[in-house]
Amino acid sequence: MKVTTLALPVFASLASANPVEPRQSCPQVYIFGARETTVSQANGYGTAAGLVNMVKQAFPGATSEAIVYPACGGQASCGGISYDQSQRQGTEAVVRAVTDFNRRCPNTKIVLIGYSQGGQIFDNALCGGAGSTLSGSALQAVKAAILMGDPRYVAGLSYNVGTCQAQGVSHLSR
């Protein structure tokens, strides 16, 4: 009888404990995509969609998500959000999304694909220029960044290193 009396409070406390969260399945490759200015969030990746899909096909099991940010340039249809505000919000969204994902899936290789303002927000998150930047394990998890039509691009500068087949991007000066 004493065993039952002692065991009952123990089992009762276990029943009231928070349920165990199911483990998330982590892909080997995860792609973050970002659309260009004036393309609605409903269009997800914008012009970068084709490339996002090509990378997913090249790496079976790879998954992706679009960065949620305004992608505005001051137009009325965007509530007048300026380009500067939009790219700052986008950069913050990148840092938050990549960091959060990396915490959940620390061994997943991350690919960033963006076009125009979408490329710029990834550029900012990697190299600085608009608020916070990726750091630590989240930065180390980024294995590829494809920035097409990036407004920050200036031909001939030292950070224009490599090609699609060799080397890569070195960090911009902050």
Question: Each PLM stretch: what is its role?
Answer:
Residues 23-108:
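Active-site catalytic motif of lipid deacylating hydrolases and related acyltransferases
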Residues 98-102, 124, 130:
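Membrane-helix exit/interface motif
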Residues 150-174:
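Lipolytic serine-hydrolase domain surface
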